[in-house]
Amino acid sequence: MPARLLRGLWQRWRRYKYRFVPWIALNLNHNPRTLRYVPEESKDKVISDEDVLGTLLKVFQALFINDFNKQSDILTMLPETVKSKYHNLLSVQHPRVKLLEYRHQQQSTFKPEEILYKTLGFSVARATSSLISAGKGVFVTRGSVPKGAVVSMYPGTVYQKYEPIFFQSIGNPFIFRCLDGVLIDGNDKGISKVVYRSCSGRDRLGPFKMSDSTWLTSEICNPLAVGQYVNNCSNDRAANVCYQEFDVPAVFPIELKQYLPNIAYSCDKQRFGNLTMKKR
């Protein structure tokens, strides 16, 4: 029993020490390969924000069309121009869309990861990490990822620097700090999960969901919402992706916000999202 307890404590320490400030200060120079210096935010871009937004819209529209038979409440609230746009997308003479429409007629839909593969040419999923004691990781399950592609989003509740996050942060390895000090809590368990669900329900407008909460479950509607499980590089394995910060614009289509895996802790804030990008 003591040996098992000590082994468990040692494993927890190996995971936690990278967030323990004194240990980081003493060991910073021992791992030069894992350091990444960013001179300023404007230079920390793999691709432009326009390209990021274009990718998100492309994927989210494909997911929306795939769920078209479940969107009746939303469609009735949209302007005619927007409704006609989606009806036109369904009727486009393209083999992929034809097959999609046929599946709708059969009261069936593609899985989200299949939509991602058909839209971007690859799919990703969570699985046990190949790194020792790293828990879960993210793997490309189909296709290949080109350089500069958006491969995932970092989900979670978005906290401004002045907002309370102490209790959520205890023993939480999924808190991501942005360059400007904004924090994203990507933990899908415990109090973090409760806070996210509460904020998501608070911001809902009738049939319109302002965020996606399915990343908290095993049945994810947005297949990109796995970024919190992307592991850092190690001395043995270099990073093949990097994080790029992106603010979702206020004019983002309201019918597609149901796929955004982020929600602001305060209802008056509309800051969303970190994206994981293909780096090399």
Describe each PLM feature range:
Residues 1-280:
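Conserved catalytic SET/PR domain of SAM-dependent protein methyltransferases, capturing the structural core
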